[in-house]
């Protein structure tokens, strides 16, 4: 009966512990290990059959967007020459991405027009990652592949459009195939590899890099958190302390990874944009 109850609610990882409060080691119940079921959610509204529903990740994505817009609106709605604390924090974040990522990768003159896109991507990705360690939410939206895929698609379309606009069809062809006549007889093979790398592998890896890191990080956090509770019985208590310490350590590490992955995502975005504007020789 206990196993059936756990299976019934396992779609929501935030409910695992709540429905297994009397399940500890040596009690005869199995360890409620995290898995793919930890990333599946029942609709908060609607149903899966109709493909029209609203679930927890969607809610977090919406709330995250509102938080970001609200933060910058509050910081810049009445900008001051001598900035207050909120404006100072917002300016520091904005300026870090503008100067440290966009200007350094694309250049000041060409990059200025892409600052809004890159800043928006950075803070959105970062916020979606941060949900993983925020109480009650405790789920990184970017651990669901659809979200990184859409963001990567936006960058991909921007890159293709910009390449066509700046270099024309011939320039686009040379750009995506890495055309270099000095390669001689291996040129056809090199062009084929480069074509698949740019057209298929590039957007795939751009999305999967973010998704895989958030998926793995959340799984580890769930594992140590659940283990801390599960081991609270008999001699297992000693190991529960170790698991709890690992939960704290992994949370701190995950906080670093969340910011790093947001940074890497926009850094690659700027690299692709810069490559689209660079004339291929």
From Swiss-Prot:
Keywords: ATP synthesis, Cell membrane, CF(0), Hydrogen ion transport, Ion transport, Membrane, Transmembrane, Transmembrane helix, Transport. Its main location: membrane. Key component of the proton channel; it plays a direct role in the translocation of protons across the membrane. The chain crosses the membrane at residues 56-76, 117-137, 144-164, 181-201, 215-235, 237-257, 259-279. F-type ATPases have 2 components, CF(1) - the catalytic core - and CF(0) - the membrane proton channel. CF(1) has five subunits: alpha(3), beta(3), gamma(1), delta(1), epsilon(1). CF(0) has three main subunits: a(1), b(2) and c(9-12). The alpha and beta chains form an alternating ring which encloses part of the gamma chain. CF(1) is attached to CF(0) by a central stalk formed by the gamma and epsilon chains, while a peripheral stalk is formed by the delta and b chains. It comes from the Bacteria. Belongs to the ATPase A chain family. The keyword Hydrolase does not apply. It is a multi-pass membrane protein. One of its GO terms (cellular component) is proton-transporting ATP synthase complex. Gene3D superfamilies: ATP synthase, F0 complex, subunit A. This is ATP synthase subunit a. It is found in: Cell membrane. The gene is atpB. PROSITE patterns: ATPASE_A. GO terms for molecular function: proton-transporting ATP synthase activity, rotational mechanism.
